[in-house]
Amino acid sequence: GARVGLKFWVNDAFMGQTVARGGPYIARVEAQCPREVESLEILADGEIVATLRDLPAIFSERIDGLPEASWYYAKITMPGGFVEYPSNIAPAEGPWAWSSPVFVEG
């Protein structure tokens, strides 16, 4: 698949870790992608709560003022669609990358 280096924090908690309940909640994303990024979305409890568009292939961004949630994750979308083959072959490469979630205590 597309080789994307993606790091995601909420406050001081790295993806896969747990952050203390009680805001403010601040996301930080660092990414190294093979091409420019159409959008960076921050999701909280499955809902998109922040979107940044037209980012370079290598970036570091901070998003302030996230709403309280039970978990957060980051999703990157690069240009291009998902390649579909007329068979049951499922290619690993696509225009997306996701972080692991950051969980909120309690």
Residue ranges and their predicted role:
Residues G1-G106:
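C-terminal functional module detector
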